[in-house]
Amino acid sequence: MQKVKAIGRDEPPARPSHWRANRRATRRVAPTLIAWIFSVLLVSQAAAVELLDDRVITIHSTRDVTAKRQALIKYVWGAEGFPKRRLPDMVVTNVASPVKQLADLARVDEFRLNMAPGLQGLAYHFIAQHPNGELVVLHHGHGCTFDDDPGPADVGFGLQRTIAALLREGYGVLGVFMPHKRPGDCTGGHDAMFQMTNVIGSPIRFFLEPTATSLNYLKTQSRAGHFPAYRAFHMVGLSGGGWTTTVYAAIDPTIQCSFPVAGTIPLYLRVGGSIGDREQFETTFYAIAGYPDLYILGAHGKGRKQVQILVRRDTCCFGQRQHDEKAAGMPYAEAMRGYERQVRNALAGLGRGSFRLEIDETAPGHMISHHAIEDIILPELQSAPR
């Protein structure tokens, strides 16, 4: 039985008539082609972008950690602060699963959040048949469906296989979409969001609020919503979702383990397709905390860790193909290991938390591979302190 609960402002969870057509069209286009088109568009704007040099780490104490996190929250949300009490505007329970072939699924709930005129956040709560009491946020990037290839080969973006593996191990999954990258609204247009007027704080808030408000609901409404009372929260994201994972884990220390996949590298190493959309390089934001600082914030704390996964043969961004060895002064892996070493040393000085970089040598393109899921993400989750 389906139950609709309007928590805040009313807006029906309507699915326009073109929704199914968009969904079918998205599935017909090979993800590698989508990644290639996306990278070409990014390269075309690269020459006009001047990136901040973020190679210097500015966090040296726990006081710095607190101050940086507070400064980021103030930048993103202004005087309103982090939305720690806001819930989704609408919750629809027991919806048809948007992802096929999930053997260990008990139920799916749908969350919708009205963020601005014409801008609605969407997330799905996949409840495991045999819950282990923990939940993983899985954040998509520049794709509009989680229902990609379910097979044993490394095909597609890897969202379906990630959900299936997490459910198999008993983890609840919160699947979250980027702004304007969801069923019913696959228009993109992230750069245009930074031209919006009357935004309190920064448009970056629209990338983070669907996760924040959905987690608020999951942390407080288990009895009323008839779902497991989760005791630990983790996060995985691909591409733009990997960027979201990096930033969200830096801001919200309740994320214990985080796994940004093909999502970011420091700005000083970026060229071409690795530059990304505006949220990836907005100077006023990264002047507060560059990427190495964000990695520290996302990993620092008792029992916290961040494992960043890059794909060597990435067809979009942050792989060897997108690396400028001449500009960096060193080969791809050496350059990546350089910032990993800096972040690890800084965390060692702070005394709590761990950071590690994995370069996926098996994935043939822009994706979460079976290797990343089975040999990196799941073992790290299962070994996390409890």
Name each model-derived stretch.
Residues 10-16, 24-31:
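Short, low-complexity intrinsically disordered segments enriched in A/P/G/S/L with frequent Arg
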Residues 88-130:
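N-terminal cap/lid segment of alpha/beta-hydrolase-fold proteins
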Residues 133-142:
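Short beta-strand element of the alpha/beta-hydrolase
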Residues 141-209:
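Cap/lid segment of the alpha/beta-hydrolase catalytic domain
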Residues 190-239:
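Gly/Ser-rich "nucleophile elbow"/oxyanion-hole loop immediately N-terminal to the catalytic nucleophile
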Residues 238, 244-284:
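Hydrolase active-site cap/lid region
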Residues 266-349:
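The feature captures the conserved acid-bearing segment of alpha/beta-hydrolase catalytic domains
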Residues 331, 337-386:
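C-terminal catalytic histidine-bearing segment of alpha/beta-hydrolase fold enzymes
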